[in-house]
Amino acid sequence: MKLKIDCIRKRHCYCHCLVSNVYKSNFKFFRIGMAYAKVLRRIREQKTNYNRRKSMLMGHRDFITVQISNENTQVQVIHPELTGDKVISSAHSRFLIEKGWKGSRKNIPAAYLTGYFAGKKALANGTNSAILYSGTRQYTQRMAAALKGIIDAGLEIPADEETFPSSDRINGEHLKIKNDVKNIKSSIDTGAKSK
């Protein structure tokens, strides 16, 4: 209690009260204001960066998300609406198993082919341009490889060519388990033409 009174006398902000462990007591409000400032749930869970999302929505364009998990890569082309975001096309790296892929499905060549597949599906659904929305995630080489795959599929996306991985890494020449990226890419093309 003495610590609380000293804090009010010095007229410190509630941040000082939090540091001095007053927030652990039964007092929820202080004379100088609340001891707890509410943080939105999606910010707390690190799911949404609202500043990035607001600037992305101001452009009135479709956007691309790349999600890389422990085993797979998922690329989605999304159209924002007031009722909620609508997925136009989605590609998951599990489809690579059907094409004869061996090894990891989250590396740079797998991300490139997943992005290429998502781009072909988006073109078939009538989407010609989009922007990348990374959300709370950092822009990595695997995300750049997926973005290059979407651009190679034919979508118009503003991106800097210098950020993309080299063609040797996209073709998987640095990997121990070799996969034929060009054959899988051509099979994606033939599958898109048949539909």
Where do the language-model regions lie?
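Cysteine-centered motifs
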Residues: 7, 13-17
